């Protein structure tokens, strides 16, 4: 009678859950870590049926793209730890959108169950993110459920108190009515997508009658009189064909994700 092959689970950090008995040693995850993520922390030890995929020192993968191995694994040996037992795929509503967590604009699919975002997956776009997304893009949705402001607050006597949406809308309307339009300006945050920014711009121009709006954080300035000041001289896909890239005071690995 043949012995049953059992492999102990590996510790790959808070994002990747392992069930290594399922592993068929295809080494997709190993090749991704080395060739795509540029972090050769995954590898195979042992020979034959004793071969195991591991991080060598039993530690978390130190990569901003580590969770992509979940999508690559063909047998479910590597799965998403935060998503475990959350929902079944056929129960989820799938919405295609664009990531706003960084300036890359990765194409993503948001899977929701009722009003909760359960997971974020990449959509293939060879010109931008190919088929990968960063861990921040994939797991930032965790913050949408916990420690999130979902009720408006109004400041009374230097203290914030809960209020209804109708109360807030009435106060906003009153402020607009009693303020000269020349003194009204609008700002959008760093995580606002293009569609929302456009609607905000249309609201200010058509409803309020002002063209004073901006998106830049404090102490930043962009002279938009010339297109080259805010448009890169190459597409993301074209970077691979560049003869020379000069970076000054920046590290795209950490700052672009």
Regions inferred by a protein language model and the residue ranges of each:
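Catalytic alpha/large subunits of respiratory electron-transfer oxidoreductases
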Residues: 19-20, 25-26, 30-31, 37, ...
